[in-house]
Amino acid sequence: MTNNTIFDDVFRTMVEKMTYLVVPLINEVFHTAYPEDVKIVQLRNEHQLEDGEIITDSCLRIGDMLYHIECQSLDDETMAVRMVEYDFAIALEHRKKVDGRYCVEFPRSCVLYLRSGKRTPDFLEVELILPDSQMCVYRVPTVKVEHYTKDSIFEKKLLMLLPFYIMRYEKSADIIEKDSEKLQRLLSEYEDIRNKLGKEISISGRSELYTDLNRLIIRISDYVFRKKEKVRKGVGEVMGGKVLQLESERLREEGMAIGKAEGKAEGEARLSALINRLFLEGRSDEVQRVMTDVKWRQKLYGEYNL
């Protein structure tokens, strides 16, 4: 898997399979107030132009509004022009004809920057000069993941940013790998993220989201720290990656005839249900033990009839 593909893949997985996570991000960027259960229509991401096909990261409709979000892992200088191109393709595709005249309305768009620096703008801007000399500035807001603390992510329910949170430590990977104190601080931070995520999910009632997001968090962390064994292994264990894998393996070994993928899904759902019950009953301090102690985990499965 290439450098940027893993980030695009994780982003699109959330957009396509956990679409409700996009709502708080849209509210944050465009100052809307959609409820989390608002109806979202996923539109196709392939837009055909005369000179070829354009593929966007996400195109959504809420009510009568179109939204377009691009996920960008690098600060590409051509991004502003590309956004005009993408948005024009989307607008053309959804054009309307009223009283004999076409109306081409551009979508509300933004760019999610997974990495950012001093030169990353708050808005991407392009001057459009029309044949009659009219000039307008096309502005697209940007979202910089690095500007959000873990606390602000949970306060604003921007759970969609969690898998990419680890990328702020990318440049200090060598130091963290060699410094046990810094490594422990990072692991403590991710233990806090895991606990906050569990509490958030126990409130929302979406128990399956716990394992889904954990899996994506681990996936990005594994890639970012692929050459840093201590960090990669530490984050994976804190977020429960080893346990999720063991659960799916155990179910398959018991001879479940539902196939590898379904066995993994059932194991993750079982663990997610147990963790959810612990949070609901105020036993969050037992989650870490559940993640690491097989016998204790089996005992609680029996206690909750899972």
Positions of predicted regions on the chain:
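Short, charged alpha-helical interaction segments and adjacent helix-coil junctions
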Residues: R61-S73, A173-L306
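Conserved single-residue anchors adjacent to enzymatic active/cofactor-binding motifs
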Residues: M1-K228
